[in-house]
């Protein structure tokens, strides 16, 4: 939503100019094709009372994910203090002006007084700094594509911030025994992010799985067989289909339980399967594909992050996918370094490149039937891997730019979905920095979001974010961690 502020321009004519110009800008932004959501024009804000009223309307409007402000001319910033103090959603400060070029032949003091965003935006920016308030600043000309895309990118972050408070995670298992990094303070997570993380006995969900009708299971199995390649690999065809049907029942039962109880993310653990016949594999992959968050071995933080990142990418054209992921093993051959990413079963098929197959293989973890799972290799290109960790006195979001590649050779004996990437700036520095930061072996991974977007999300949440990218050096990174330990200390 666009908000505009006037300092009480000397005459109605000038105020009309300001309103007309802001309408033109809003209309152009909405027609640009570069914004994922609509910008709603609002009248010029002149008084303290109007500013407070408008910001509080934005607070209570469930369809409003944030506010965009622009100072057409000088705007005394004291008038903004109360409104900003009461405002609770993301804010973007667009530093632009209506005219692209100085009208050299006709410019006079009237024009200067009416078109001084260079003045007004500095005054406005100062009060944010004085109030120590987080905001995004985008500078440039409003008709330029790069500026419009920056606004569009921020919109997705704003949606992620606002929708975070609606994320509810269902845990059907506790944390894996003796594992540290997947632990965390769920109360602090609800304070910081708005996440509700609730536990259910696994057999309560098993009841929902067992209640799924055979007809519904058969229908979903037919969908699987139509959509995916079936790789029997010598297994009995009838038994194979029966195992696939178990996953269909798990998918339908879990989804109904999640929806009936208003959860958007789920956590499982192979050590606590109760009456489930198989470790949920294909079922969890399909739920992630539908937009649910997922975390394995009790990892509720990553489950919530996957959900948030899937919300942020909703409706994105040519999206390449977002998934739960785990670091497994390295290729350390010089010039071909990288990390093989996978999980026992649960990798989201939105990141798949090419055909997707169903396989069944024995799995020692869980001590259940051989589970059906989707198997594929992932897309190439730039992506990000993120890890949210609990340091005891604060959360830290670690964000790594990675370059996804194809493995040098196929891996015919590996019966799981995989990705392969090289962390920036390279495997050596990238992994050293990740370990120094305390990053987990689980990540929320996306081709469709940027480090900037996730850093902006963290800033809005008031938590530390550290970046590992092409410019990272270990000396600089260790200093940053040291400074942050002071800056973010409670």
Which positions does each model-derived feature cover?
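Short, well-structured alpha-helical segments in soluble
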Residues: 51-64, 81-83, 251-260
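C-terminal catalytic subdomain
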Residues: 291-415
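Short catalytic helix/loop segments, enriched in acidic residues and glycine
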Residues: 14-31
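Extended hydrophobic packing segments that form well-structured cores
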Residues: 367-490
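Cap/lid and interdomain-hinge subdomains that line or gate substrate/regulatory clefts
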Residues: 36-39, 95, 100-235
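Periplasmic-binding protein-like
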Residues: 64-72, 92-94, 263-268
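Single conserved hydrophobic/aromatic residue that forms the stacking wall/gate
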Residues: 2-9, 13
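Active-site loops and adjacent core secondary-structure elements that bind or stabilize anionic groups
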Residues: 12, 221-260
């Amino acid at each position: 939503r666009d908000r505009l502020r006037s300092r009480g321009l000397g005459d109605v004519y000038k105020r009309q100019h300001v309103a007309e110009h802001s309408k033109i800008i809003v209309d152009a932004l909405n027609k640009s094709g570069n914004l994922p959501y609509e910008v709603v024009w609002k009248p010029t804000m002149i008084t303290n009372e109007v500013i407070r009223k408008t910001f509080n309307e934005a607070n209570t409007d469930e369809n409003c994910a944030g506010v965009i402000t622009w100072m057409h001319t000088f705007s005394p910033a004291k008038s903004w203090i109360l409104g900003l103090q009461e405002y609770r959603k993301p804010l973007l400060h667009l530093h632009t002006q209506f005219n692209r070029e100085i009208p050299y032949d006709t410019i006079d003091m009237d024009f200067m007084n009416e078109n001084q965003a260079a003045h007004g935006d500095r005054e406005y920016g100062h009060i944010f700094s004085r109030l120590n308030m987080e905001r995004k600043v985008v500078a440039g000309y409003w008709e330029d594509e790069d500026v419009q895309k920056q606004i569009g990118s921020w919109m997705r972050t704003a949606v992620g911030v606002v929708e975070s408070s609606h994320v509810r995670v269902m845990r059907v298992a506790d944390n894996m025994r003796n594992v540290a990094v997947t632990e965390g303070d769920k109360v602090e997570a609800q304070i910081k992010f708005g996440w509700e993380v609730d536990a259910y006995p696994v057999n309560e969900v098993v009841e929902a799985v067992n209640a799924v009708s055979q007809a519904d299971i058969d229908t979903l199995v037919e969908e699987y067989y139509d959509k995916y390649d079936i790789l029997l690999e010598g297994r009995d065809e009838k038994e194979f289909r029966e195992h696939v049907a178990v996953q269909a029942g798990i998918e339908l039962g879990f989804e109904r339980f999640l929806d009936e109880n208003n959860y958007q993310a789920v956590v499982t653990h192979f050590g606590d399967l109760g009456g489930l016949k198989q470790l949920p594999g294909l079922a969890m992959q399909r739920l992630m594909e539908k937009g649910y968050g997922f975390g394995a071995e009790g990892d509720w933080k990553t489950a919530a992050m996957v959900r948030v990142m899937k919300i942020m990418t909703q409706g994105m054209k040519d999206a390449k996918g977002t998934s739960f992921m785990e670091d497994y093993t390295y290729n350390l051959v010089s010039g071909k370094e990288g990390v093989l990413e996978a999980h026992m079963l649960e990798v989201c098929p939105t990141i798949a490149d090419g055909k997707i197959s169903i396989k069944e293989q024995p799995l020692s973890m869980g001590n259940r039937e051989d589970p059906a799972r989707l198997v594929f290799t992932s897309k190439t290109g730039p992506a990000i891997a993120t890890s949210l960790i609990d340091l005891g006195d604060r959360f830290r979001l670690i964000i790594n730019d990675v370059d996804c590649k194809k493995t040098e050779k196929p891996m015919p004996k590996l019966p799981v979905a995989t990705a392969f990437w090289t962390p920036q700036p390279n495997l050596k520095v990238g992994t050293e920095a990740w370990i120094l930061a305390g990053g987990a072996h689980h990540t929320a991974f996306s081709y469709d979001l940027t480090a900037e977007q996730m850093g902006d999300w963290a800033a809005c949440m008031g938590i530390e974010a550290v970046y590992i990218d092409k410019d990272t050096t270990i000396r600089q990174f260790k200093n940053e961690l040291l400074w942050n330990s002071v800056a973010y200390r409670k």
